[in-house]
């Protein structure tokens, strides 16, 4: 039997800034707009590769989150999603939330996208600190 790892374990290894960078890289924003990759460490590149693999298989979860939660108020929707997830939170479910947040962080301007990425990272990082 495979044991699910708990998401709060990630909180020891990843910072809020790291989360913002991961969200930015998975948001769909072209690299040329960032002018350089934001993930400069091998650890974060490995995490990004894992997230991109998960992204391929989470479409039905994204659709369900969209159907249930998308009101057009990005941070409110993300906070509601974080409150509604089952506890204890697994890494797989956390990654699904991160990818969903990345999808809605993307907008037409680099500065606004980065601001949304940072806001989403703050919400998700607080979720990592929750051991309930």
UniProtKB/Swiss-Prot annotation:
UniProt protein name: Protein LH2
